[in-house]
């Protein structure tokens, strides 16, 4: 009931349009590549006789998105006396640390060895990006179109349907992102997939392996040598994906309610990310011509500290605040 009440009060707005919240407060949503529909939020507070207050909240931020053509920040925003609250998820990670090409290399290697490939994905953003990458591998004749690709996860399937809906304005050149030989999985098909060891690709939620159909596939394939489980995104400490990271071959692991021996190849790629890296975050801050203050949030303590030090080295500002620092 609360959700329905909330949704009935939601009003869609365009990017870069000022919204008057009160006579003295205006809000503007600014483009953000984190996910489809993501936005940075600029709050402008103006009272007669007082210095204007402008605060930009980046939220989860990325400077790019496979499915969007992002525009530059408007100059009217860049020239304001601005305080920025910025995320720091990858504030200590350099662009140079990203292993580009690892995903394709691992997938094609596993196909050559006729393995079953499990690709845990997040429902929104990562699912569609992985489907696009698999299509690109097919289009360049690197991935055999006869290899079946199964797509599991109700929420991921629902989000993917939205990408195909003209109401979501994604890049026209990316609208045809389905790989050939793609099958949407239901419960019946899922059971059949567990009964065969033939070469196939299974794209499944959840991204960290903790929820969704991944909790069905991983326990089954973790003990098989002819399987690759390739995590395509961030695995938070304590998540199932993170717990598998340090398990050696043949080591006993707990998977849901099962205790299994790990013989599958479990790998992790970092080339897909919905968060900007440290240099890209700095690049965003450098766009502002009159920075008043910077506050860092959303990151591990050591990451926030490292990013704060980088800001002080590279941005003309004397101090940086860290929110929720332990």
Residue ranges and their predicted role:
Residues 8-16, 180-188, 321-322:
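Short acidic-hydrophobic, aromatic-tinged amphipathic segments that line or gate anion-handling sites
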Residues 43-46, 72-76, 101-102, 133-139, ...:
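Short, solvent-exposed amphipathic alpha-helical segments in soluble enzyme
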Residues 212-221, 273-289:
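A short, acidic, amphipathic alpha-helical segment used as a generic capping/interface helix at domain edges
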Residues 253-284:
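Generic long, charged, amphipathic alpha-helical segments
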Residues 105-240, 297:
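Hard-cation-handling environments
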Residues 1-129, 133-144, 148:
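His/Asp/Glu-rich metal-coordinating catalytic cores
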Residues 73-80, 143-144, 220-225, 286-290:
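Short, conserved loop/helix-junction motifs that constitute active-site signature segments
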Residues 29-33, 56-61, 85-89, 119-122, ...:
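Active-site neighborhood of phospho(di)ester-bond hydrolases with catalytic His/Asp-centered motifs
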